[in-house]
Amino acid sequence: MLIAGPTASGKSALALRLAQMHGGVVINTDSMQMYRDLRIITARPTPEEEALVPHRLYGTVDAAVNFSAGAFVEAAAGALAEARASGLLPIFIGGTGLYFKALTRGLSLVPPVPAEIRDAVRLRLDRDGVAALHAELARHDPAAAERLAPADRSRIARALEVVLATGRPLADWHGEASPPLLPPDGVTAVFLAPEREALYARIDARFAAMLRAGALDEVAALAERRLDPLLPAMKAHGVPALIRHLRGEISLDEAAVIGAADTRHYAKRQFTWFRHQLPEFRWVTPEEAGRVVDQEFQGNPSCTTSTASS
């Protein structure tokens, strides 16, 4: 069972209900909820929720780690094998489209980039700026330079690292994929699609609630580690704005406005990405999701605990 959707769409509640009803294990498919440093700001399930049914891959990665899609697939394979061995229904839930695509389409086989090349590229990025790196990328991989936004620091650095390390453009590697862990025709996949304005209001309310729950203290503890700002955990929605507040650059109210706005923009991108990249997912509203999923369970024998290994 795959449950995707934008942030704050009600995925966790649906997954918890299904796991309780059908003997399932909830497997995280959200890149930011992997990080143990970020329980509050990423809206991870609470300890009380995690105690109700088995949860896997939540808070298992240190913020200093640049956790890749390949590492996720490896971890997901272990969680899936454990679920099947225990006779539990695996329920993959999250909002990271690349993770779902890797699960159902396979993963491009990009070789690891040597540390010395990665460090050299990051050093030049900090020293010379993103425009210089974009110009260098245009010489080595014109197609990538044309495709990427000139200010997209992370993706420009990644594309340059790969072409320097392998001699091949990143797009070439993306054309070669490993076999999928979950073939699309063997899973039930839904995308929760709330009404936009209601979703955005929920995002704003949730960000305010996270601040009341201690998100600022959580981010302060992360900032004290002085990690590379390009690491994924350091770019989680709300983290950069709250760090700016902690540095005295903006007020807490301004940080809250920026953090909520960044999250709304991300939700909008999630709608677009899933519509174009994973059209096989069935789009449902949160209100109809329970009924639709129950119908899928009744009509699909693989959606049962007794055949969870199929």
Curated annotation (Swiss-Prot):
Q: Which cofactor does it need?
A: Mg(2+)
InterPro entries linked? Dimethylallyltransferase, IPT, P-loop_NTPase
What is a single Pfam family found in this protein's UniProt entry?
A: IPPT
Positions marked as site (Interaction with substrate tRNA)? T96, R118
Gene Ontology molecular function: ATP binding; tRNA dimethylallyltransferase activity
> Could you say which residues bind substrate here?
T7, A8, S9, G10, K11, S12
Show the Gene3D superfamilies listed in the entry: 1.10.20.140, P-loop containing nucleotide triphosphate hydrolases
Residues that hold ATP according to the record: G5, P6, T7, A8, S9, G10, K11, S12
Q: Name one GO biological process term.
A: tRNA modification
Residue span of region Interaction with substrate tRNA: 30-33
The subunit field of the Swiss-Prot or TrEMBL record says:
Monomer.
State the function annotated in the UniProt record: Catalyzes the transfer of a dimethylallyl group onto the adenine at position 37 in tRNAs that read codons beginning with uridine, leading to the formation of N6-(dimethylallyl)adenosine (i(6)A).
In its UniProt entry, what is this protein called? tRNA dimethylallyltransferase
